Amino acid sequence: MFVAAVLAGACVANKAAAQDVPLISGGVGFFTSTNDGSTSYAPQIQPLIAAPIGKSLLFESRAIIIESFFPNGGGQPGYGHAHFAGPIYMQGDYIASRHLTVVGGSFILPFNTYNDRLSELWIGNLQDGPLIAGLGTMGSGSGVGGMLSGSAFSSSKASISYNAWFSARSGNYYFNSQRSSGGRASVYFPESRLEVGVSYDRSLQNTHENFFGTHVWWEPKDTGLRMRSEFGRGEHAQGYWVETDYRTRAFGASEHWLGRFEPVFRMQQTFRMNNLRSDGVPSVNTQRADFGLDYNFPHEVRILTSYARQFSAARDVNVWETGIVYRFLFPTWKGKAN
């Protein structure tokens, strides 16, 4: 997965300076969401550990602790409360070569890009995930089994990366997964800073289902603009989302207070092909537009604000959201210099 590749590469590359010291990273945040007039609150923390073992092995895991406070329904006053704590994934990586990493354990399914690249609370520009985030992620978003990933080809003009995985069925409360398999292939063009990829998953238990996806990421050089998009299709629904954000390069860029503002826009639509539901996509055709304005403080602190208008045959709703996120990163102990 993308995070694994980055952390593994960083840990191995910095071995001389840090003697393979485990890193603890993650984020802590506090979020509010007002949906159709009802406001809920959700403080949470997502710690992540990456622990190199020698030159070729890496253990990594991310967990979540979340408290949710929400209005009591049925005209009852006051708030209800829910708590969850558990691992999101826990895996071991064997870096066989620069072209191949072998992953075993509980891993995040690499279908399209949101699940394994953008779902961390310190990375996403908007509090809510896309409406099609459930397509191809087999309910839990993770698998228990093995995965092969790496760079199949790389040059100054283009690079090709791949993931291929198989997951067994697991009914464990913390490591729940479906029997399934799939893969993803992406091509990146460094000169144009463009990435295009395709994904395919197949559920292999109960009713077998196929999922198809494609993604396009583009970051035009020297503009401060980013565009990310996905299309996903399952047996019962399909949809897409397109998200853009912008950080000005004027006024000293991120060193100036104006350069820390980050406007965000996401447009998305979902379409149901039948009334069967096994994918987490809304039960009726839905359109949603999100308008966000984030502020990036120094020292890894972000404020997220957004307004969304959602249209569907069921009803139209307004969604107001705010949040503050702190990203942390530190070694577990001081390494010895060679």
Regions found by a protein language model. Give the residues of each.
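Outer membrane beta-barrel
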Residues: 20-26, 37-169, 177-179, 186-193, ...
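Transmembrane beta-barrel architecture of outer-membrane proteins
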Residues: 43, 86-88, 168, 179-181, ...
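Solvent-exposed loop segments that connect transmembrane elements
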Residues: 71-80, 272-282, 327-338
